Swiss-Prot record:
Protein name: Succinyl-diaminopimelate desuccinylase
Cofactor list: Zn(2+); Co(2+)
Cofactor note: Binds 2 Zn(2+) or Co(2+) ions per subunit.
Function: Catalyzes the hydrolysis of N-succinyl-L,L-diaminopimelic acid (SDAP), forming succinate and LL-2,6-diaminopimelate (DAP), an intermediate involved in the bacterial biosynthesis of lysine and meso-diaminopimelic acid, an essential component of bacterial cell walls.
Subunit composition and interactions: Homodimer.
Gene3D superfamilies: Zn peptidases
UniProt keywords, alphabetically: Amino-acid biosynthesis, Cobalt, Diaminopimelate biosynthesis, Hydrolase, Lysine biosynthesis, Metal-binding, Zinc
Sequence similarity: Belongs to the peptidase M20A family. DapE subfamily.
Organism: Pseudomonas syringae pv. tomato (strain ATCC BAA-871 / DC3000)
PROSITE patterns: ARGE_DAPE_CPG2_2
Length: 383
């Protein structure tokens, strides 16, 4: 069934946003809708279009006192085969089971709607609140993420903007809304390793150097290496090879080089420099002719128990009756950029069971629960 007009304000806004096909980095006027609502609520608006990416920064309150920022993204991943969906992925339907179906329902237009409605209600109820309520919204989270939150944070840092606490609306929950929040993320360090050999005929191996044979022991050692033990907040650092390419396709040619793509998801117990040095030592130990191109996607960050995590946890408890679990599992998020400002960052959003899948969906009523959790958190920190 199509979402009826008598839905809650949060669900009405969520459906409006989902119906806008904002496949990364296209915003499809989602931010126009959000800025109009925030402007009407008295927020100061600052659009920041950077290259082909739409972003905005919005604030309500004074420069004196703490700042609580809601952060999120309007872009979504591609739908995949439309014919495999139970409905058009941009129709925003609520089915007979009460599930809100559509691309972005969980990741993360539902959260955006809940944040905005909670903030509207809070500034109406507490017009003279402490500090500031802020929004940092981008259309470049699901893509390269070069001109989105990262670029906005760089601008905010350059002018010494204060940002004490941040709630990122990523879908953190696993079974029930609020059962898990993310209080940190592992770092992500990628690499493209090239091992050079010498091309030749398979019948004359003495005239060639097979990079597959040469590199295999080193790759096996890298895969077996114990990088660290993790800690109370993070599991041990992991190393995974994702791609191996070598050869011409012919059966009688020894290849001239091998390319391996691998990734570290690393804890706060390891550093970028330390991991790079240990990789180099292993490759040199095996006397390889090698080169590595490194790509750092993000450093690990952690928000330890304190004002933000306490406020979020107690709000979840008061609204749902549930105790929440703080976790650092999963991939990277834009929280990694915001944390560089020294900000306490917590991710809290809907159930993530169907994110990036065909028939992405969440329980529609969860968005009203999420709205109340966000509202109560605002009250605890800024009222």
């Amino acid at each position: 069934m199509t979402a009826p007009a008598d839905l809650s304000p949060t669900l009405q806004l969520a459906c409006d946003l989902i119906r806008r096909p904002s496949v990364t980095p296209v915003d499809a006027d989602c931010q126009t809708v959000m800025m109009q609502r925030l402007g009407d609520a008295g927020f100061k608006l600052e659009p920041m279009r950077i290259e082909d990416v739409d972003n905005f920064w919005a604030t309500h309150g004074t420069r004196e006192g703490p700042v609580l920022c809601f952060a999120g993204h309007t872009d979504v991943v591609p739908t995949g085969p439309v014919q495999d969906w139970q409905n058009d992925p941009f129709d925003a339907l609520i089915d007979e089971h009460g599930m809100l179906c559509g691309r972005g329902a969980a990741d993360m237009k539902g959260s955006l709607a809940a944040m905005l409605v909670a903030a509207e209600r809070f500034v109406a109820d507490h017009p003279d609140h402490k500090g500031s309520v802020a929004f940092l919204i981008t259309s470049d989270e699901e893509g390269p993420a070069h001109h989105g939150t990262k670029a906005v944070v760089e601008r905010l840092a350059a002018r010494n903007e204060r940002l004490d606490w941040c709630i990122v609306g990523e879908p953190s929950s696993t079974t029930l809304v609020g059962d898990v929040v993310k209080n940190g993320r592992r770092g992500s360090l990628g690499a493209k390793l090239t091992v050079r050999g010498k091309q030749g005929h398979v019948a004359y191996p003495h005239l060639a150097k097979n990079p597959i044979h040469l590199a295999t022991p080193a790759l096996a050692e890298l895969a077996a290496e114990h990088w660290d033990n993790g800690n109370d907040f993070f599991p041990p650092t992991s190393f995974q090879i994702s791609n191996l390419n070598s050869g011409t396709g012919a059966t009688n040619v020894i290849p001239g080089d091998l390319v391996a793509v691998f990734n570290f998801r690393f804890s706060t117990e390891s550093t970028v420099e330390g991991l790079q040095q240990r990789v180099a030592a292993i490759l040199d130990k095996h006397e390889l002719d090698w080169h590595v191109d490194w790509a750092l996607s993000g450093l690990p960050f952690l928000t330890e128990p304190g004002a933000l995590l306490d406020a979020v946890s107690s709000s979840i408890k008061s609204v749902t009756g549930r105790d929440t679990k703080a976790s650092t599992s999963g991939g990277t998020s834009d929280g990694r950029f915001i944390a560089t400002l020294g900000t306490q960052v917590v991710e809290l959003g809907p159930v993530n069971a169907t994110i990036h899948q065909v028939n992405e969906r969440i329980l529609a009523s969860d968005l009203d629960v999420l709205t109340e959790i966000y509202y109560q958190t605002l009250v605890k920190l800024l009222a």
